[in-house]
Amino acid sequence: MTPQELLAELLLKNEKEGRRMLQTDIHIFDGPSLALLVELIKREADRQWNNNAQVSFMLAGYILAIGDLTNNKAYHALGLMARGDALRRMDRDQDSLPFFDASGEEFKEVGDEVGWARTRIGRISACLQLNRTSEALRDATAAREVFMRHGKLLRAGQIDVNAAIVNYELGQYDQALRLFDRAIETYSLQGEGVELNIARALGNKAITLAPQGKFREAVALHEQARGTFAAYGGQEVAVAREELNIAQIFASQGHYSQALLLFSRSRTIFLQHNLQFQAAEVAQQICLCLVRLNRAREAFELAGETVTFFRSSSGHRHNLAYSLMYQAEAATLEGNYGDADVMLQEASIILEEGGFMALASIVRLQQAELYFAGGQLEDSQREAQHVADAFAEQEALPQLARTALLQARIAASTGDINTAQYLCDHALDIAQGQGLLDLKYRCDYLLGQIAERRSDLEAAARYYDRAVQGIDEVQNHLVLDERTSFLEDKGNIYQRAIILALKRDNKDQALIYVEKAKSRVIGDYLRNNIDIRLRAGDKAGEAILEDLVKLREEQAWYSSIVYEAENEANLSDTAIMRIRAIAPEQARKEMQLRERRIEHLLEQMQLRLAGDLVARQRSSWTNSIVTTLWPKLEQDTTMLEYYIAEQDLYIFQLTRKGIDVHIVQDAVPQLERLHSLWRVNLDLAARTAGTQDQAQSFVGLEDNSLGLLQKLYDLLLRPVSHVLDNCEHLIVVPYGILHYLPFHCLFDGTQFVVERLDVSYLPAAALWEICRQRGERIETKKARLSDSLVLGISDNGRLQFAVQEAEVVAKQLGARPMLDNAATASLLWQFGARSPIVHIAAHGLFRLDAPNFSHIKLADRQLSTIEVFNLDLSCCSLVTLSACETGRAVVGGVDEVIGLGRGFLYAGAASLLPTLWKVDDASSAELMEMFYQALLGEYSKTAALAGAQRAFLTRARTSSRPYRVHPYFWAAFHLIGDPGPLL
């Protein structure tokens, strides 16, 4: 039996069986063969560190057994060291120290000075994890001297790297850099075969450069190290570590999407190699990105998971402190100042006890920011001053800039404008020099406020403009919903810029800022043709798609239980059995769990698809998007764009003559009250419709609705009625709560607005040109109306007129209606790309809690917002969603509209006809027949809708059911996007 064969046999045994085999077979090996066997076992034990530390532990036991069986103390010492290394890899650092110490003593006894020095390598790492840094540095000095004396250059370099890491953790960056450089120099003296060692040292040196703000140099070193590891092969974990480090720098600079992409990639590799500890460290870094993107709840929960993980691990106390810091930051963002303070106090104690003063300073900076958020200015100033001195001494420039900005905010809050200016300029200088995007715009914003307080409006306007541009720069590096969440707390910056521009009578500039805050995500993606549709193309992408399909099926199943339980009387026996299989409360939890997983996977896919686009600079949002808009409007067209600041309403009026603005002071409280009453009226109308006494009940409801709609008209349109006198087409660009109001059925005291004007809507004025060009492009294609896709589902008889509506519309278009079981979502993927019209009459559900999962119920699945994004509707002139609340949305960011409509616009549709509330299916069917009749009669889309609504009103007023004049029956439909001709 050869040593190689014995090792192969040992790997198949448990430790007890392996020891018996050694007792039986060890005598057959002579001295050289025995030495080879020990070397092979030790090499395999080292190889198993990252794969299976338990196997490494067992192999160390075999070396110990060989030492005992042969009375060879050197082998026994080697076994002790190997066992210590295995324990360290099992996160049992405290348990590993006695083995390293015993091993060192035995090596000394046999006169092996180098062997003793080798035991210090693992011991230093264990001491670092146990916060015994003085011991670690003492061991490093002694061991290096031994290695150099014996010409063991690789070992000497390794010791220097370990000592440098200890100094880095202590915040002694200059000493750490000197040691890394010495290690690299020592490796180079060795000659060949040191590339991987040098790469590791370069990567660690880069980590030390980052806290000093030397980001470009650090990234270059990480890239160099990553290239070396990738070239050698079999270094997946090492490559992942370098990507993790690059991601940390990207996060510091405000490139959050790039950071999240690399974090996700490295975390996946760590988990694949069962490196739970390293995966938890990556999760910590992800928390930081989530906080910066205002995703506080996600960050808090993820940080909580890492807190639990590191509490259960022996040692690693500074990692626990990191987790507490990130969780505290998320708690602060949510306004839970008390919880955040408790977390920071625990983190501070851990770090100060361990001597991690650099990290302890960051905790104190967080405490200073927490005090400032809570209005404790004196406490905040005290802590900030302390850490400012510490960061200056450490040359930790990013943290120093962050501290200076906080001190500037404190000074500004206490009226010390000169000090605030000085400190903020200092912070901005550092931020600009280091490329700290997130810090730059915040400095410019504060400088704008300072200039405004000094009545230097020109300087204030300049600073505010730079702040807005800074936000744009960060957004350019984000994908989809990350942009929306990032903007959540930026409204005040836009507001100050807008109000100051108006104060300086710069109406164009004010409108530019309003537009920059509105529906930027969909607008930017459409302008830049960024394709984030899910598609197979690589193994990783296909795996994500498979997971998404499975999760989406499960989410839809639980969703059907949650939202159909209320209508059990109308369900099939199968549906009732499904609902009774699990309680709706538990089903809701399961549904929400899968929705979070789906959104996470979608984000990963979007990062993969758009990653290279967010990494490079693109053409940014330009002011000409607004300034060239109004001259292109038709002579008879007026665009009204609304904005809300504090309690005031701003109405921007765009006509071919130019831009004007009217301010309605103290309008917001009235708007909120009237909107609430309007929703109550609609809800009552929905309950009353179809009842036996509906004719009598609607008398009061109609009078009430007219009163509410007239008051809304007085606030929203009467102040600018003079521009409507010569107008035929009104384009409304709402803001905030106004997205939920039907401007076309506001009442002027005599008639509804739609009775004298054609009305269409846009989420943002900047989308007007995009939608108009789409309409013109589709018009030139001369598509056949018979290729239109018309779907109708009665939903087990609950929507009696949906199928009838689809049949009538299909007949008008010369298309084949797809009804009930034939009305599947798969048809949209199969035929949507060549359909000039997509008409869906079905049940819709708006999800206020999760707008990305608002959906239309089709025969084979729920067609949700996230799936609509993946459709190709590039030849579609009009999408009609004749279903409940398909036009409702959640307003996120500053004014980002999130709902089904956004998905259809992204998919390529030129215009959209959704509903603002739960509709009466009989009235909808009647209105749709009138609409398509007008549309096919050469009317534009907006004129056809207005004509249909006028015809409906005329018919209702002269019929036996005059109560149908109530807007509930006819006004839910509104046109979004291109108002022009169909084809």
Task: Write out the residue ranges for each language-model feature.
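Amphipathic alpha-helical protein-protein interaction segments
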Residues: P3, Y441, L457-V754, K781-L789
